[in-house]
Design a protein with these regions (language model features):
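A general structural signal for short secondary-structure boundary/capping elements
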Residues: 33-37, 137-143, 165-169, 188-192, ...
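A cross-kingdom feature marking solvent-exposed beta-strand/loop segments within repeated
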Residues: 169-205, 220
């Protein structure tokens, strides 16, 4: 029984290590920078700047991204879509609001795949997702290619969350064009030392650090839940384990 419990614990630890590796984290302990980022966003220890104790500035989407058309449009009723990724396949991104907009995976010449480390922008549903792999798209999906130097996917996670929030009130069928997408305005945090309000003053370091902190907090919650389940399993096994009785002979 002890061996069985030990195997369960090893399995749990292996899953945690795999998740940490996938997210690029080595542990779930918040660094001082990450704690400061959370405090700043929550308005703690701030100098009164708003919102969230940070200085924010409005930018046009076109200031930070090139708004590009997909290299090729794939219609779902004319292609073979795989539920899981197989060899030589790439994500097929559509206007869905879940699973990063990925409907499945398709195989075609990679020359038609859009660049990885970009954002997909659904024109009718106004959903925005970070895409970590090269990908194909369905109809009415634009590609947002960063004009700034790409340093971390976490920065694009931060920006996509901001865009998703401000675009949420827009309704299906409203429509959009390359030009109108480039004109969308949204706010980003500025560096504490910023004296101007230009692209070079955007605090990309804060964005990356803040997302890191959120990921660690999420994993901490999963670990606590997993620990509670493990303890409950141990107790259940202990109660069900047969008690050895004295021999009759």
């Amino acid at each position: 029984m002890e061996k069985f419990i030990a195997e369960l614990e090893q399995c749990r630890l292996a899953e945690l290590e795999a998740y940490l590796k996938a997210t690029g984290l080595s542990n779930t302990t918040l660094s001082s920078d990450e704690e400061n980022a959370l405090n700043a966003f929550n308005g703690k220890n701030s100098g009164g700047n708003t919102p969230c104790g940070l200085t924010w500035q409005s930018f046009k989407l076109g200031d930070l991204f090139e708004v590009l058309s997909s290299k090729k449009i794939y219609r779902a009723n004319t292609i073979k879509i795989h539920d899981t990724q197989i060899e030589n396949s790439y994500p097929y991104v559509v206007r869905a609001a879940t699973n990063n907009g990925i409907k499945g995976f398709i195989i075609d010449d990679p020359i038609f795949a859009n660049e990885k480390n970009t954002l997909s922008f659904a024109q009718d549903t106004f959903t925005v997702f970070y895409q970590k792999q090269p990908y194909f798209t369905g109809n009415k999906v634009k590609i947002l290619k960063p004009k700034f130097a790409f340093k971390s996917p976490k920065i694009l996670h931060f920006i996509s969350a901001i865009l998703q929030f401000i675009l949420k009130p827009l309704i299906w069928g409203l429509g959009s064009t390359t030009e109108s997408i480039a004109e969308f305005k949204f706010s980003l945090p500025l560096k504490p030392t910023a004296k101007t309000q230009t692209l070079k003053d955007i605090d990309f370091h804060f964005m990356r650090t803040f997302i890191n902190a959120l990921m660690k907090q999420t994993i901490q919650g999963v670990v606590q839940y997993s620990n509670a389940k493990m303890q409950a399993t141990k107790e259940a096994i202990s109660q069900e384990a047969p008690t050895q009785k004295d021999s009759l002979f």
